From Swiss-Prot:
Top-level enzyme category: transferase
Lineage per the UniProt record: Bacteria, Pseudomonadati, Pseudomonadota, Gammaproteobacteria, Vibrionales
Protein name: 23S rRNA (guanosine-2'-O-)-methyltransferase RlmB
GO cellular component, one term: cytosol
Catalytic reaction list: guanosine(2251) in 23S rRNA + S-adenosyl-L-methionine = 2'-O-methylguanosine(2251) in 23S rRNA + S-adenosyl-L-homocysteine + H(+)
Encoding gene per record: rlmB
Molecular function (Gene Ontology), one example: rRNA (guanosine-2'-O-)-methyltransferase activity
PANTHER family per the UniProt record, alphabetical: 23S RRNA (GUANOSINE-2'-O-)-METHYLTRANSFERASE RLMB
């Protein structure tokens, strides 16, 4: 993660709950009294984590303009996951739901997609190592804690990884405006990976050709597309709905 910094109450709480050894020190807005913040600071103190109080300008400088809610933590880098970790992830789920992002380069969108994936119960988010947003502090802040708990798998060859998933029985559906049927008339149950492409460009050709099926979100108004994080949430939760029937 860029600068090994995480911003905001949710992100710090998530690291504290899941991997507290990553926490090095925490910077808190001086004289801030907050019902959400005080219990968190107590937990951090109990673990012996250094807490430094700083003025707003100092925190703003550390956050480089990003919203920080008065708390910033310096952390050790999280473990980097790759295609070799997918076997372990899949073995831990009988009916896995995965999200694949192809060409999503905006950290805000990555963070929002991670949050959507966590809320929908996905077991992992897969992105290519190249032509993809990195897990910056901004992405982590937007993810609202999900970046610290959702496995983010970076792969060298996305199409090859998709074929490996298919060999393990994962059905892969890609979203495309020219698809012949929509998400509400598509089977989204069973082991499943949903592929979302970049806004405007969509999925790359090889990614599209590797999908088992193409689906679309029906659009009733004048706009032709949705923000990728919004579209991701719609697709993931339609899969969640179908799995509960």
């Amino acid at each position: 993660m860029s600068n090994d910094m995480i911003f905001g109450i949710h992100a710090v709480k998530a690291v504290l709950a899941t991997d507290p050894v990553r926490l090095i020190e925490v910077f808190v807005l001086k004289d801030r009294q907050d019902d959400r913040l005080m219990p968190l600071l107590t937990e951090l103190k109990d673990l012996g984590i250094t807490i430094q109080h700083a003025g707003r300008k100092a925190l703003d400088d550390k956050a480089k303009g990003a919203s920080h809610q008065g708390i910033i933590a310096r952390v050790k880098p999280a473990k980097q996951l790759n295609e070799h970790d997918l076997d372990t992830i899949l073995e831990g789920s009988e009916n896995p739901l995965l999200l694949i992002l192809d060409g999503v380069t905006d950290p805000h969108n990555l963070g929002a997609c991670l949050r959507n994936a966590d809320a929908a119960g996905a077991v992992a988010v897969i992105i290519p190592k190249d032509r993809a947003a990195q897990l910056t502090a901004t992405a982590s802040k937007v993810a609202c804690g999900a970046a610290e708990v959702m496995p983010l798998v970076r792969v060298t060859n996305l199409a090859r990884t998709m074929r490996a998933l298919q060999d393990k029985g994962v059905w892969i559906v890609g979203t495309a405006g020219e698809a012949t049927h929509d998400i509400y008339h598509s089977k989204l149950t069973g082991p499943l990976a949903i592929v979302m492409g970049a806004e405007g460009e969509g999925m790359r050709r090889l990614t599209r050709e590797t999908c088992d099926d193409l689906i679309k979100i029906p659009m009733a108004g004048s706009v032709s597309s949705l923000n990728v994080s919004v579209a991701t949430g719609i697709c993931l939760f339609e899969a969640v709905r179908q799995r509960q029937i």
